[in-house]
Regions:
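Active-site catalytic motif of lipid deacylating hydrolases and related acyltransferases
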Residues: 20-95, 148
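Structural recognition of the beta-strand scaffold that forms the well-ordered cores
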Residues: 23-27, 59-62, 96-98, 106, ...
Length: 283
């Protein structure tokens, strides 16, 4: 209901006096990407979502080094550069940002710190809202495990990386400090200047006898089933539900909007179970 009301308010605000140019940006999660279109999101996801645009060319797939701390030039600086270029060249004034995992933290840094970089205010102004898929807003215990260097590190390195700055940042205790001092949108903090809508994956399906296990890659879902054992019962194998809902506002839990289907952390960046259609219709 709140999401619908927000959309109505935006429409009333835009009015009919001028036309807007809508665009969509796909912002990847932890790690360095050079071809996130093919490697992170995959074409089926991107090309399905952008069908919701009046001009399907008005999209950008971000490629940055999110192995760095969120505020660095390689992370938020890189994101600001690519978003600014996109907004400027395509004349975008109604930007929907779709983030996944740690990408939500990088985008939230921009929204929370408009004076940190002279480009941030224009990005914030152009942004309609952020659709934050499985954001690690309160960190993840898996980052704690990797940084502690225990034997579990070998099992999650493929997913999270090995003791990078971004992994250090996503330790639960570190994110608590950032949320209390540097980032907006969590409980007890001022609201973000634009909507930050959480899409929450709440379970992992990995049975070889269940066809749901194969969407996005069976072996990846099996790996997330293993990592889920380290997390709360409500998790996507990487992010606990409490972390995914820690900042901004809840949009939906997977099974409530996808016909009872669950999204693992891998599946929530792919065209699985109609997620792409929900995101498309939001544009």
């Amino acid at each position: 209901m709140f999401r619908s009301l927000a959309g109505i308010v935006l429409l009333l605000g835009f009015g009919s006096a001028f036309a807007t140019t809508t665009g969509v940006a796909f912002v990847h999660g932890t790690g360095q990407q050079t071809d996130a279109y093919n490697d992170y999101w995959q074409p089926a996801m991107v090309n399905s979502v952008r069908q919701g645009l009046a001009n399907q060319a008005n999209y950008v797939v971000i490629n940055c080094d999110f192995g760095q701390y969120m505020w660095t030039s390689g992370a938020a600086g890189c994101l600001a550069t690519q978003l600014t270029n996109f907004i400027t060249t395509k004349h975008i004034d109604d930007l929907v940002v779709i983030t996944h995992s740690n990408g939500g933290n990088v985008m939230r840094w921009i929204l929370s710190n408009p004076t940190y970089d002279s480009r941030y205010p224009a990005i914030i102004k152009a942004t309609r809202w952020v659709n934050a898929i499985a954001p690690s807003s309160a960190g993840t215990p898996l980052a704690n495990a990797v940084i502690s260097g225990n034997v579990f590190e070998g099992a999650v390195g493929w997913l999270l990386g090995y003791q990078s700055d971004a992994v250090r940042q996503q330790q639960t205790s570190w994110m608590a400090v950032y949320n209390a001092n540097n980032l907006l949108g969590t409980k007890g903090r001022p609201a973000l200047p634009k909507g930050f809508w959480d899409v929450v994956g709440s379970d992992v399906v990995s049975s070889p006898f269940n066809s749901d296990s194969y969407c996005g890659g069976y072996t990846l879902n099996v790996g997330l089933e293993v990592t889920q054992a380290w997390l709360a019962s409500c998790s996507d194998g990487f992010i606990e539900c409490t972390s995914a809902t820690a900042a901004g506002s809840l949009w939906f839990y997977d099974h409530n909007s996808l016909g009872g289907k669950y999204l693992s952390h891998n599946q929530s960046r792919r065209a699985c179970f109609g997620l792409d259609v929900v995101l498309r219709n939001d544009l």
